[in-house]
């Protein structure tokens, strides 16, 4: 959106995020910036070391939201089965669509062309029979391209697929799997499911299924929000508990406001806190609590501060709540 509205930004390294003065975090970066190693969720200071000539913009959320809504409206012309993942990403199930003679490949191509024509924005797409492969395919021909994994190609594609490419397999998990001699989905196909279950539990079964091209998750139009949170990256590290308590006091009204938007009765399943230390290690602590409560959050944070800080400075403080499962909430209300 920024490059569309200002063509001078198109070919230079650009990122949306915190300023050079205050410590912030990169929200997103364009492809010229990514060539220097700049990534989302990266501290701004790190990004500037990698790319000193990086152009930083504070971001215009309203403009991004407007573009996102327009794109969702384009999606809806082809199917009602849409599962948004973020402002700029969504799953679409077009298996019952009559557009383009029912061809998912042609539908994806037409959607991309429509986005470019109506919004002057580029889009990438992945087409596959199951969700996780569509996600992987969407990253194959970025930017402004698409990649198709037809049903008859799944077995061959998956066999050679590195496990690190599977959504949910992070660097730590990939390293553990590598140490076990498991680098590709083909390696997992030749391994024992019982061993994976013993070593990784539920994740072991998911890994086994994905390695066989199995993903039975359906598109969920009405994805239920599971949590609400608010956090602050600090301009300078803090080392004294009263400073942390003051930040929580300032953050709490915003958490209360955000929660009230989705749960006016403020009923929750759990609430907790997050602290990020100056070595970038993160700790969270939460427990079951029926209703948003500031005093309990402060007590929880104080406990984490005393037991887990170890003299380190704190660079981020966050508060969050986990929402009640709607079905469980109905049961509780019926019980009352």
Protein language model features and the residues they cover:
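DNA-contacting surface of Y-family translesion DNA polymerases
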Residues: 165, 173-316, 324-329
């Amino acid at each position: 959106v920024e490059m569309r509205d200002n063509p001078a930004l198109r070919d230079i390294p650009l990122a949306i995020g915190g300023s050079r003065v205050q410590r912030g975090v990169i929200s997103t970066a364009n492809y010229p910036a990514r060539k220097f190693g700049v990534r989302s969720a990266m501290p701004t200071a790190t990004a500037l070391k990698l790319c000193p000539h990086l152009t930083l913009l504070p971001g215009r959320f309203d403009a991004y939201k407007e573009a996102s809504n327009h794109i969702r409206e384009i999606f809806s012309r082809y199917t009602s089965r849409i599962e948004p993942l973020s402002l700029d990403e969504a799953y679409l199930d077009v298996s019952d669509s009559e557009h383009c003679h029912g061809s998912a490949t042609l539908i994806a191509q037409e959607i991309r062309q429509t986005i470019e024509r109506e919004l002057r924005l580029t889009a990438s797409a992945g087409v596959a029979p199951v969700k996780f492969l569509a996600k992987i395919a969407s990253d194959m021909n970025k930017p402004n391209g698409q990649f198709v994994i037809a049903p008859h190609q799944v077995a061959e594609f998956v066999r050679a697929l590195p496990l690190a490419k599977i959504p949910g397999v992070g660097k730590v998990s990939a390293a553990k799997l590598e140490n076990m001699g498991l680098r590709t989905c083909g390696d997992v196909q030749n391994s024992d499911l019982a061993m994976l279950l013993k070593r990784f539990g539920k994740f072991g079964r998911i890994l086994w299924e994905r390695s066989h091209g199995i993903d039975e998750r359906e598109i969920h139009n009405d994805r239920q929000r599971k949590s609400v949170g608010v956090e602050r990256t600090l301009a300078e590290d803090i080392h004294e508990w009263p400073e942390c308590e003051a930040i929580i006091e300032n953050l709490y009204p915003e958490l209360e406001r955000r929660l009230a938007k989705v749960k006016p009765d403020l009923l929750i399943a759990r609430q907790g806190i997050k602290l990020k230390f100056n070595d970038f290690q993160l700790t969270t602590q939460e427990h079951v609590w029926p209703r948003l409560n500031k005093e309990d959050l402060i007590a929880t944070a104080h406990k984490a501060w005393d037991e887990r800080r170890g003299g380190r400075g704190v660079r981020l403080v966050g508060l969050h709540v986990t929402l009640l499962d709607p079905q469980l909430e109905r049961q509780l209300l019926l019980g009352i």
